[in-house]
A protein has these predicted regions:
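Short C-terminal tail/terminal secondary-structure segment
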Residues: 2, 148, 214, 227-228, ...
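Alpha-helical segment proximal to the catalytic Tyr-Lys
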Residues: 127, 172-176, 236
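Conserved glycine-rich cofactor-binding loop
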Residues: 9, 16-17, 40
Length: 252
């Protein structure tokens, strides 16, 4: 590898599987150090060990909706690896229901994980990384569902659209204040992850492929490499931008 992330220290939420695990793997391969998070310790410890030793990657048990836990996460990461330079707010969930059939509990749960959790990470990231000349980068995982309306993903659409616009606000604020913190969003299309695997039935999987102009769904590494770019100094002039990786889905 080309050591594009030498000297970078990243927090990757939801980093124990799927896109988050791929991001962590590529970050370490490019010279970065990573703290991955998740709710299940056994899964998290195994995931970290699959990538490297504790000198380059560790696991911290954390629910992205736990506001106080974010402070503990930052402290643990900086104790292990030094000043945090990068946050990848990747933890997310979806309930496959229309607005009409979504319960209040399901609505609040998806907004809590997908939007509140990203807000906590973005806010604390700005507070802790600003004015330190770290080339700091906050990468917020949205979705193509932040652009389009899906009849069976009402709450998910709302949460991912919220991530998209909130990130723009944060990016402009940081730029105007010369904080040296960039904020961007990544918008995956259909990617081979547990979230997509949970789509109901073989017909849904076939639909995901046929709706994508390239004729197939993406791989987690397709998203991970975009995140490497955004975490690196190569993207020093990119902020408030939307990086769509969807095989042409939203170009239709």
């Amino acid at each position: 590898m080309s050591h594009r992330l030498d000297g970078k220290v990243a927090i990757v939420t939801g980093g124990t599987l799927g896109i988050g695990l791929a991001v962590a793997d590529k970050f370490v391969a490019e010279g970065g150090k990573v703290m991955i998070t998740g709710r299940h310790a056994d899964v998290g410890e195994k995931a970290a060990k699959s990538i490297g030793g504790p000198d380059v990657i560790q696991f911290f048990q954390h629910d992205a909706t736990d506001e106080q836990g974010w402070l503990d996460l930052f402290d643990a990461t900086e104790k292990a690896f030094g000043p945090v330079t990068t946050i990848v707010n990747n933890a997310g969930m979806a309930v496959n229901k229309s607005i009409e059939n979504t319960s209040t509990k399901e609505w609040k749960q998806q907004l809590a994980v997908n939007l509140d959790g990203v807000f906590y990470g973005t806010r604390l990231g700005i507070q802790r990384m600003k004015n330190k000349h770290l080339g700091a980068s906050i990468i917020n995982m949205s979705s193509i569902e932040g652009f389009v309306g899906d009849p069976n993903l009402g709450a998910y659409n709302a949460s991912k659209g919220g991530v998209r616009i909130m990130s723009k606000s944060a990016a402009v604020d940081c730029a105007l204040k010369d904080y040296d913190v960039r904020v961007n969003t990544v918008h995956p299309g259909y990617i081979k992850t547990p979230l997509v695997d949970d789509l109901p039935g073989a017909e849904a999987a076939m639909s995901a492929r046929t709706k994508t102009p390239m004729g197939h769904i993406g791989e987690p590494n397709d998203i991970a490499w975009i995140c490497v770019y955004l975490a690196s100094d190569e993207s020093k002039f990119a902020t408030g931008s939307e990086f769509v990786v969807d095989g042409g889905y939203t170009a239709q």
